């Protein structure tokens, strides 16, 4: 042991040398002696005590030597005892916690350490005065002080916390010390006391000096000894018990009190001591110094920095003996429930005597010591705070005197030191309970835990006494392990501190009643009425002191006992009453009055402490029970509120409460307390309401029951008045001005005032009122009539009661009988009657109730005889109501009552159901004649069930809707007509002679009519004359059809209401159902009226049957007849419009009359989908090219079929064509339309009506369609067919009869864009007489292709038979003049003379068919304008106008005498996979720019079919170039080139600058070479649409990609399709550029075709590739093709600059060297850089400036360019043979470089193509690239959104090029864009 001590001494000396900064020096005279004494005494004590010498001491020394200094210093609770520790103030501060922990044995070790420290600091020993101070020093403390002064010890915090709270070890050690015996303790305590007395004088000065010295920086020193083994698991955050604010007073009182208590220092371990709870050095955090107002001064004293972390400040008065303290030191984790009887008695002096301090000091001396300590401590902590110190000391002295007086008055003989300590909380240790009488370790430990930053740490104790508020407890809620309802928003929690401390019922604490929100006591609503426990008279100092112990776990631990001068006022709540007691006297007995009475007269102190401990110990169950009990505890307060009239919240004494509160009130309060255990705000309000209303009412009832006489009732208001509104008295509320209460009570006061006002009228004398009918006849008029027993009892006594009493009676009685209706105690009449407005005057005189829905029943006056007067006989039964009175009956007769029962005398109009007087013969509303059988028929058939009903008074509501017997119902429109009406007033259907039906409801259900027959299918009753059911058209059983022809026509008028509504939708027996579309068709229909599917196994009814049917039908034979064909009408099979029989074509869609066509047998248009080709919906008019063999219908793609019907012209269609279409009914309208039509023709572009004499539209100058102008077509020259712009169904008349032989190429009928179902008559191919081609118009879905009936939905693989190709061998020599395609919304069916197929043009001549805007497939029969080239005729495919992807006019100029059948299957939406043995050019439609006409340059190359709108890639034959770019406005210019793979540029922003022909978006012409099987979805070298934005890709499968062999189609859905250069013929989409010298027809596509909307179709130079500029951006400009295959620059519209890049090694076209293919200038800002043309909308098309004012530039060698109709400024280049495009908005047709009208941004520059504005993505290719080199795209176009442009002019290009000549350089400035900066949110 001594060896270890020597080692410690040596190590400490070394540390002292190492750390010279330890300022705590010990006086030389004291140091040696005292330390030796201390060592000896402590050693002796250790030897005496226990095995502590051997076990504890050695273990501690060893552990301390093992552990590092930081750990040992923190963990070893310095165990030196109070003699040494308390000798000097500095030591006191360090040893106080240790001593309060009661470690007696550790004194020796401390003494040893002090001796060692004194030796170490011997040089500075003379600074100290006496040994007592030196003994107070502890090396651990000094080292810790050094550590704290120098460092924050952040790393050691956790270990410190753990060791600091290691109560278990400390208790263990203390237990060992306690076992050693009390003799040594007493001796040490005596020694400590002596030291204390000696050092009293010196403490003040020396402590400050020592503290300053210690505050001087002291280096860290290892603590060589750890006095207790460190058990880290036990040291982790032991649970804290009390949240009492930290008490700096511990330090203040350290020296005196600890000396006074020699063995046990009860000074709380203040942080300033640097000792933790167990005497070991504390953490660096000082407790809040409550003595000093200046916290900063503490920093200068070397104090620990303030920390929010709560620190433990155990009150020094916690326990007197070491043993008791040992118990209180039980570690919290292992803490057993402390004994209910605390170790300490309530008498501090006795405790001191027990601990050996009794003889040493009196309480006065103790107080002096405490004052001295506090003063010294204050001086030490802050030299500058002398004023504060003095004030604190003065206050302490003052309170000491007060406390001494109070304690003297107490029987408890509580020491003043306790009171002083406790009341020095604000100064010394705010929140320490100096006298925890029944406190255990939990209480002390938790009671002294508080936040250093607590806002309630107040240095002014006087203020604290008055300002103790629940926020203290709220602040420490987290510190207590107990449920606190205040956290959870309970109203009673904040208002009612009872819940803040469940323990506080028996022992009051001021905090319990203090409000957290305002100064003063917490009260519900601002009043303290709910808090019965706060009363100075109720609380005694002893109870308060006992409450102090509970306060740690009790009500509000932060609230100290503010003992006032009178004996300590315990601001605590009483504990739960553990014994039966009178609620009134409980407060008095349990809480002593005035300090003269001990707490709990019937309970001993031990019992009280036990109960308090039980109460303080918290478990969830206890907390839950406590909440309920706390409510019960306040029954007395509630009783007082309820009973005290004047001051419900001010209760003087329980006796006065008992006097004022009746017994039943107490009972009710008890009852409510049981009901409302935990009152919510709603419950509290309800309780208040019940108190006002229900209880008062019950009281009144009770009083009335007790008192028999009315005079008693008159006297009743006196006792009743408090009950009526005890809470509502304004005077009472003015006294309590707290916020919540005053607010709530204010409402109550208002109610009370209103109640008083309402009482002014005379009282309601209910007893005189009797309601005999109340029980028997309930009323539905919302009038609650009080029954007689309700009021009779109180009222019989005296009708003249005082207003208040009578009102009270009313409310009471009603509350008992109708409690739900009592919302408030207002005793007005409305309680009984909802209708009453609360005025009693209404009851004083007889008045009618206001809210009755019928005749108001007058309330009787005071006479009872008035009651039976209103006889309410109305019964709400559905039978006839009994008449209430004569007046009502008369009114009911004269007028239907509200329930809708008409008077029997009135007659009801069967038409409009208006009831008319009997004398009126016509309905006043609809003038329908009065029924003949007026009332008798109506009444007679009434079933017996209705006989009981009083017919006069009640007629069913449904009767109003019954038909009149005389009225007859129109079978067509179901409208009831008057009997005299011969025909229906609505639809004029003639009346049928049917016997009038009896207007009964029941017979309809029960009895069958003799004159009706019931349909066995739909159970609908039909009239006898009807041969078939009107609903399902089932034949009448057992009856032959009277009208065989009309059997399937619902001629029979539908029966009246008897016929079910659903019967009309039932299938007729004769009708047949279409297998394709499931539509029921009439029996005579040979094919489905919707999808034209032929009827299976049914011979078609002769058309003659239709007229016979119609002739047999009576006029106006019913509603169904309106849907039947008239005799002289025929129904268009395409649009189902009825046409006159004289009309040869449909007036709506211009589909030829199938009958007429069948008679001609030229083209069977009634093509129903055969079984091979599935029809999806109604068939559109399709040209049936019988001779054409490879017609394919691909659903949604190639077929120009309507969306509704996929009709492919098949053999069945041919068979059907033989039969005549029956004439349609409704001839009048048709004739009118026909007459108008014959006299006028409608411009399909602008829909203007023009006189037949005009050949052009008067509005838009669109040329007259061939349909109106058959003469326009020339026999030998293929007149450019103008597709008609029709929103309806485009119908192209076949101008040429099939009889016409070859050599006459009929003007190619332009496929018309018909949104509906348009039939397009194909121009007969003169060259191939066998083939008739009817261009199909705008089939949304699929057009039926004739022979190879292959209906492919996704990909139309066109298998064209070799026959067509063989027949296609003979090209027509006649030069094909380009037919201008008109702007037709319907797909223009360009009838190719050569190919008769609508969609797939299987023509002998190589005429690519351009499908006009068939969403699926354009049935564009390309009119092969067989322009005789040198070797072969180059048929110019007529471009459909405004085919959304209208197949570009694939102009197949086969220079060699090849006969590739250019079959243009327009694969709509999908794929036109044309597997044609011969080269078929299928132009897909639905490209907004029609497919560019392909120009097979090589002789071998067949014309590429531009597949319109292939989402994916289009397959092209390698030889021919397929330009099917799905441009919405971009024409793909196919430059004549060798059949090398054309690179397809995908649109949508990436201009695919592919040398090959760029396929316009939807008009991607996929030309498959002969024997090239175009397998759809086969990879083609076409960049995907949508996918590659300008990226050139090969082998893309289009959406339904028609894979052509070796052909690269650029399906560009992007805006720019770069016109390919060399290899492919650069034909603009929709413009057929024929490179051969022969006139190249250029159909300007509408909206997509450059020809429309201002794409100027410019005839190019010598090779005369006519390039059409596409409107809307993608102008496929055929670059001027050099002889070596010059690139045609295709400028896409909408910023789509089509770069026609000259393909390297582009083969020379067979035509003479085409120097420059005229580039198509895309309109809308797509400049075609090739020719100098002012681009429309900023796109300068080089030669032809297309669109909106772009002048048409005449190419040097002008092939006849097909001018696009409806060019918005697109000037058609004036080619020698070019027909001027009709209605170019600003284009001068023939002027070579006309200024573009509507040239919004395009400048008509001759040489340079101005950059197109709005060039969304099109690249303008550099125009003049003589050789096959790529042309540089001109990017000057504004709005080239993703166009790759070399010029920087593209402002909106995502990366506009920095350099380059821009036509619009002024717009090249880029917008500044701020670099993105992340904005961090504020911290």
UniProtKB/Swiss-Prot annotation:
Bias kind Basic and acidic residues: ranges: 1-17, 420-433, 627-636
InterPro entries: Nucleoporin, Znf_RanBP2, Znf_RanBP2_sf
Protein family per UniProt: Belongs to the NUP153 family.
Originating organism: Drosophila melanogaster (Fruit fly)
Subcellular location: Nucleus; Nucleus membrane; Nucleus, Nuclear pore complex; Chromosome
Region (Disordered): 1-57, 70-116, 176-227, 400-439, 498-518, 580-604, 627-657, 694-769, 791-812, 1173-1197, 1301-1331, 1449-1473, 1597-1616, 1855-1883
BP GO annotations: chromatin organization; chromatin remodeling; DNA damage response; mRNA transport; NLS-bearing protein import into nucleus; nuclear pore organization; positive regulation of transcription by RNA polymerase II; protein import into nucleus
Keyword hit for Repeat: yes
Superkingdom of source: Eukaryota
Tissue specificity field: Expressed in adult male accessory glands (at protein level).
Organism ancestry: Eukaryota, Metazoa, Ecdysozoa, Arthropoda, Hexapoda
SMART domains xrefs: ZnF_RBZ (SM00547)
Binding site for Zn(2+) 4: 1074, 1077, 1088, 1091
Role this protein plays: Component of the nuclear pore complex (NPC), a complex required for the trafficking across the nuclear envelope. Functions as a scaffolding element in the nuclear phase of the NPC. Essential for the nuclear import of nuclear localization signal (NLS)-containing proteins in a Importin alpha/Importin beta receptor-dependent manner. Required for nuclear import of Mad. Plays a role in chromosomal organization and gene expression regulation; stimulates transcription by promoting the formation of an open chromatin environment.
Pfam family, one: Zn_ribbon_RanBP
Binding-site residues for Zn(2+) 1, renumbered to this chain: 909, 912, 923, 926
Biased composition (Polar residues): 73-101, 582-591, 637-657, 694-706, 1301-1323
Cofactor(s) essential for the protein: Zn(2+)
Protein name in the entry: Nuclear pore complex protein Nup153
UniProtKB keywords: Chromatin regulator, Chromosome, Cytoplasm, Cytoskeleton, DNA damage, DNA-binding, Membrane, Metal-binding, mRNA transport, Nuclear pore complex, Nucleus, Protein transport, Repeat, Transcription, Transcription regulation, Translocation, Transport, Zinc, Zinc-finger
Bias kind Basic residues: ranges: 105-115, 736-748, 1869-1883
GO MF entry, a single one: nuclear localization sequence binding
Domains (record comment): Contains FG repeats. FG repeats are interaction sites for karyopherins (importins, exportins) and form probably an affinity gradient, guiding the transport proteins unidirectionally with their cargo through the NPC. FG repeat regions are highly flexible and lack ordered secondary structure. The overall conservation of FG repeats regarding exact sequence, spacing, and repeat unit length is limited.
Binding site for Zn(2+) 3: 1015, 1018, 1029, 1032
Renumbered residue ranges of the record's region 22 X 2 AA repeats of F-G: 1287-1786
Cofactor note: Binds at least 4 zinc ions per subunit.
GO cellular component: cytoplasm; euchromatin; nuclear envelope; nuclear membrane; nuclear periphery; nuclear pore; nuclear pore central transport channel; nucleus
Subunit structure: Part of the nuclear pore complex (NPC). Associates with male-specific lethal (MSL) histone acetyltransferase complex.
């Amino acid at each position: 042991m001594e060896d270890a001590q020597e080692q410690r001494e040596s190590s400490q000396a070394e540390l002292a040398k190492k750390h010279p900064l330890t300022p705590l020096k010990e006086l030389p005279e004291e140091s040696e002696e005292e330390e030796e004494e201390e060592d000896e005494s402590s050693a002796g004590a250790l030897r005496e005590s226990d095995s502590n010498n051997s076990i504890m001491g050695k273990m501690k020394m060893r552990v301390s030597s093992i552990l590092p200094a930081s750990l040992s210093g923190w963990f070893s609770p310095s165990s030196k005892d109070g003699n040494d520790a308390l000798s000097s103030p500095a030591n006191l501060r360090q040893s106080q916690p240790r001593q309060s922990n009661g470690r007696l044995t550790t004194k020796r070790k401390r003494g040893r350490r002090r001796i060692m420290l004194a030796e170490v600091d011997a040089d500075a020993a003379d600074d100290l005065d006496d040994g007592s101070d030196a003994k107070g020093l502890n090396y651990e403390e000094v080292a810790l002080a050094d550590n704290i002064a120098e460092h924050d010890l952040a790393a050691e915090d956790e270990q410190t916390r753990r060791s600091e709270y290691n109560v278990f070890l400390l208790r263990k050690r203390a237990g060992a010390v306690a076992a050693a015996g009390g003799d040594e303790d007493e001796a040490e305590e005596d020694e400590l006391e002596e030291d204390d007395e000696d050092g009293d004088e010196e403490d003040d000065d020396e402590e400050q000096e020592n503290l300053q010295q210690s505050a001087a920086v002291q280096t860290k020193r290892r603590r060589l000894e750890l006095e207790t083994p460190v058990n880290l698991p036990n040291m982790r955050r032991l649970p804290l018990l009390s949240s009492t604010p930290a008490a700096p007073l511990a330090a203040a009182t350290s020296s005196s009190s600890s000396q006074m208590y020699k063995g046990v220092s009860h000074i709380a371990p203040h942080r300033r001591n640097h000792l933790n709870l167990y005497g070991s050095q504390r953490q660096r955090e000082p407790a809040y110094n409550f003595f000093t107002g200046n916290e900063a001064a503490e920093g200068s004293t070397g104090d620990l920095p303030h920390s929010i972390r709560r620190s433990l400040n155990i009150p020094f008065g916690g326990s007197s003996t070491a043993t008791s303290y040992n118990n209180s030191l039980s570690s919290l984790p292992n803490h057993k429930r402390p004994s209910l009887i605390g170790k300490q008695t309530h008498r501090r002096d006795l405790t001191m005597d027990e601990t050996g301090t009794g003889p040493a000091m009196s309480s006065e001396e103790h107080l002096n010591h405490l004052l001295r300590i506090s003063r010294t401590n204050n001086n030490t902590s802050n030299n500058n705070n002398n004023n504060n110190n003095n004030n604190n000391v003065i206050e302490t002295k003052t309170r000491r005197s007060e406390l001494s007086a109070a304690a003297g008055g107490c029987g408890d003989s509580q020491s003043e030191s306790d009171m002083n300590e406790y009341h020095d909380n604000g100064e010394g240790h705010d929140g320490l309970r100096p006298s925890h009488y029944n406190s255990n370790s939990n209480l002390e430990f938790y009671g002294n835990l508080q936040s250093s930053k607590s806002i309630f740490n107040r240095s002014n104790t006087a203020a604290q006494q008055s300002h103790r508020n629940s926020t203290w407890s709220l602040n420490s809620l987290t510190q207590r392990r107990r449920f606190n309802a205040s956290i959870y928003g309970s109203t009673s929690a904040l208002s009612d501190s009872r819940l803040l401390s469940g323990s506080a019922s028996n022992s009051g604490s001021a905090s319990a009643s203090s409000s957290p929100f305002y100064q003063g006591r917490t009260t519900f609503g601002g009043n303290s009425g709910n808090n019965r426990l706060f009363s100075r008279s109720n609380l005694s100092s002893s109870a308060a002191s006992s409450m102090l112990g509970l306060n740690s776990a009790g009500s509000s631990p932060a609230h100290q006992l503010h003992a006032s001068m009178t004996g300590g006022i315990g601001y605590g709540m009483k504990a739960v009453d553990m014994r039966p007691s009178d609620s009134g006297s409980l407060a008095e007995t349990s809480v002593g009055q005035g300090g003269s009475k001990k707490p709990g007269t019937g309970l001993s102190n031990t019992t009280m402490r036990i109960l308090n401990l039980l109460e303080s110990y918290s478990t969830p169950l206890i907390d839950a029970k406590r909440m309920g009990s706390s409510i019960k505890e306040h029954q007395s307060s509630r009783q007082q509120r309820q009973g005290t009239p004047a001051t419900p919240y001010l209760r003087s004494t329980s006796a006065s409460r008992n006097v004022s509160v009746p017994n039943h009130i107490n009972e009710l309060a008890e009852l409510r307390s049981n009901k409302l255990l935990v009152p919510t705000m709603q419950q509290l309000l309800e309780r208040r309401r019940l108190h006002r209303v229900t209880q008062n009412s019950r009281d009144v009832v009770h009083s009335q029951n007790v008192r028999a006489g009315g005079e008693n009732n008159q006297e009743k208001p006196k006792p009743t008045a408090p009950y009526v509104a005890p809470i509502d008295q304004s005077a009472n509320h003015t006294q309590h001005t707290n916020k919540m209460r005053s607010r709530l009570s204010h409402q109550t006061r208002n109610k009370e005032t209103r109640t008083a006002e309402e009482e002014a009228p005379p009282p309601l004398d209910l007893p005189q009122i009797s309601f005999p009918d109340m029980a028997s006849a309930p009323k539905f008029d919302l009038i609650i009539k009080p029954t007689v027993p309700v009021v009779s009892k109180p009222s019989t006594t005296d009708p003249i009661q005082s207003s208040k009493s009578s009102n009270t009676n009313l409310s009471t009685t009603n509350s008992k009988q109708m409690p739900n209706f009592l919302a408030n105690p207002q005793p007005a009449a409305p309680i009984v009657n909802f209708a009453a407005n609360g005025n009693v005057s209404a009851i004083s005189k007889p008045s009618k109730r206001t809210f009755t829905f019928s005749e108001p029943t007058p309330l009787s006056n005071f006479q009872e005889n008035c009651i039976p007067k209103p006889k309410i006989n109305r019964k709400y039964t559905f039978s006839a109501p009994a008449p209430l009175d004569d007046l009502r009956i008369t009114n009911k007769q004269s007028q239907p009552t509200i329930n809708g029962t008409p008077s029997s005398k009135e007659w009801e109009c069967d038409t409009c159901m208006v009831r008319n007087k009997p004398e009126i013969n016509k309905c006043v509303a609809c003038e329908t004649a009065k029924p003949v059988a007026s009332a008798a028929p109506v009444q007679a058939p009434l079933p017996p069930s209705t006989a009981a009903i009083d017919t006069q008074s009640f007629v069913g509501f449904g009767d109003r809707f019954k038909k009149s017997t005389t009225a007859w119902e129109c079978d067509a429109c179901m409208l009831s007509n008057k009997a005299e009406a011969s025909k229906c007033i609505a639809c004029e259907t003639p009346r049928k002679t049917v016997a009038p039906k009896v207007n009964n409801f029941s017979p309809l259900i029960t009895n069958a009519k003799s004159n009706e027959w019931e349909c066995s299918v739909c159970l609908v009753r039909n009239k006898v004359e009807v041969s078939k059911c009107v609903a399902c058209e089932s034949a009448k059983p057992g009856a032959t059809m009277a009208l065989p022809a009309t059997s399937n026509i619902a001629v029979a008028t539908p029966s009246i209401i008897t016929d079910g509504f659903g019967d009309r939708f039932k299938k007729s027996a004769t009708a047949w159902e279409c297998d394709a579309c499931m539509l029921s068709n009439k029996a005579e229909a040979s094919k489905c009226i919707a999808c034209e599917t032929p009827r299976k196994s049914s011979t078609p009814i002769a058309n003659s049957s239709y007229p016979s049917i119609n002739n047999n039908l009576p006029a106006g034979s019913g509603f169904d007849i309106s849907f039947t064909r008239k005799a002289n009408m025929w129904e268009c099979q395409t649009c189902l419009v009825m046409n006159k029989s004289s009309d040869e074509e449909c007036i709506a869609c211009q589909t030829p009359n199938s009958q007429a066509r069948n008679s001609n047998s030229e083209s069977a248009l009634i093509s129903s989908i055969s079984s091979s080709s599935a029809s999806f919906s109604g068939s559109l008019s399709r040209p049936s090219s019988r001779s054409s063999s490879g017609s394919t219908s691909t659903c949604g793609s190639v077929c120009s079929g309507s969306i509704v019907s996929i009709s492919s012209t098949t053999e069945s269609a041919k068979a059907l064509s033989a039969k005549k279409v029956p004439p349609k009914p409704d001839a009048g309208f048709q004739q009118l339309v026909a007459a108008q039509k014959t006299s006028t023709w409608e411009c399909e572009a602008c829909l203007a009506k023009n006189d037949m004499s005009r050949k052009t539209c008067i509005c838009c100058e669109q040329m007259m369609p061939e349909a109106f102008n058959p003469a326009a077509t020339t026999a030998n020259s293929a007149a450019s067919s103008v597709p008609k712009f029709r929103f309806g169904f485009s119908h192209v008349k076949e101008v040429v009869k099939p009889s016409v032989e070859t050599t006459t190429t009929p003007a190619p009928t332009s496929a018309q864009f018909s949104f509906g179902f348009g039939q397009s008559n194909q121009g007969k191919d003169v060259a191939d007489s066998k083939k008739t081609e009817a261009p199909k118009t705008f089939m949304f879905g699929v057009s039926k292709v004739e022979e190879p009936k292959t209906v492919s939905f996704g990909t139309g693989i066109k298998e064209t038979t070799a026959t067509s190709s063989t027949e296609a061998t003979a090209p027509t020599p006649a030069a094909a003049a380009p037919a201008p395609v008109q702007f037709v919304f319907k797909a223009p069916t360009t009838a190719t003379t050569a190919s008769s197929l609508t969609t797939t043009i299987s023509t002998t001549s190589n005429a690519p068919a351009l499908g006009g805007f068939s969403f699926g497939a354009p049935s564009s029969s390309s009119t092969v304008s067989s322009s005789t080239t040198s070797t072969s005729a180059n048929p110019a495919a007529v471009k459909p106008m405004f085919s959304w992807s209208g197949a570009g006019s694939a102009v197949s100029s086969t220079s060699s005498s090849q006969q590739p059948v250019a079959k243009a299957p327009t694969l709509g939406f999908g794929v036109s996979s044309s597997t044609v043995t011969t080269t078929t050019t299928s132009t897909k439609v639905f490209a907004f720019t029609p497919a560019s006409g392909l120009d097979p340059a090589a002789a071998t190359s067949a014309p590429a079919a531009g597949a319109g709108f292939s989402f994916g890639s289009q397959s092209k034959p390698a030889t021919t170039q397929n330009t099917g770019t799905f441009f919405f406005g971009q024409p793909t210019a196919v430059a004549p080139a060798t059949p090398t793979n054309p690179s397809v540029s995908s649109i949508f922003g990436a201009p695919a600058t592919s040398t090959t022909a760029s396929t316009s978006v939807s008009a991607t012409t996929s030309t498959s070479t002969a024997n090239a099987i175009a397998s759809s979805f086969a990879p083609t070298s076409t960049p995907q649409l949508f996918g590659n934005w300008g990226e050139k890709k090969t082998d893309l499968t289009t959406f339904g990609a028609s894979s052509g062999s070796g052909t690269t189609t650029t399906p560009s859905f992007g805006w720019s399709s770069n016109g390919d250069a060399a290899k492919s013929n650069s034909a603009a989409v929709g413009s057929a550029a024929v490179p051969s010298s022969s006139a190249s027809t250029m159909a300007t596509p509408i909206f997509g075709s450059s020809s429309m909307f201002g794409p100027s179709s410019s005839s190019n130079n010598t090779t005369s590739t006519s390039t059409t500029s596409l409107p809307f951006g993608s102008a496929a400009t055929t670059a001027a093709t050099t002889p070596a295959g010059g690139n045609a620059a295709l400028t896409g519209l909408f910023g789509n600059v089509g770069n026609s890049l000259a393909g390297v090694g582009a083969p020379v076209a067979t035509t003479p060297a085409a120097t420059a293919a005229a580039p198509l200038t895309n309109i809308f800002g797509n400049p075609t850089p090739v020719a100098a043309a002012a681009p429309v909308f900023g796109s300068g098309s080089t030669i032809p400036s297309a669109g909106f004012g772009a002048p048409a530039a005449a190419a040097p060698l002008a092939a006849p360019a097909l001018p696009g109709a409806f060019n918005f400024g697109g000037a058609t280049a004036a080619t020698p043979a070019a027909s001027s495009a009709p209605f170019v908005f600003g284009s001068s047709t023939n002027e070579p470089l006309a200024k573009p009208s509507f040239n919004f941004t395009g400048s008509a520059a001759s040489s340079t193509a101005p950059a197109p504005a709005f060039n969304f993505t099109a690249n303008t290719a550099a125009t003049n690239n003589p050789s096959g080199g790529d042309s540089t795209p001109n990017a000057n176009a504004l709005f080239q959104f993703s166009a790759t442009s070399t010029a920087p002019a593209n402002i909106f290009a995502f990366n506009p090029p920095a350099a380059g000549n821009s036509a619009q350089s002024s717009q090249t400035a880029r917008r500044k864009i701020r670099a993105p900066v992340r904005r961090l949110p504020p911290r």
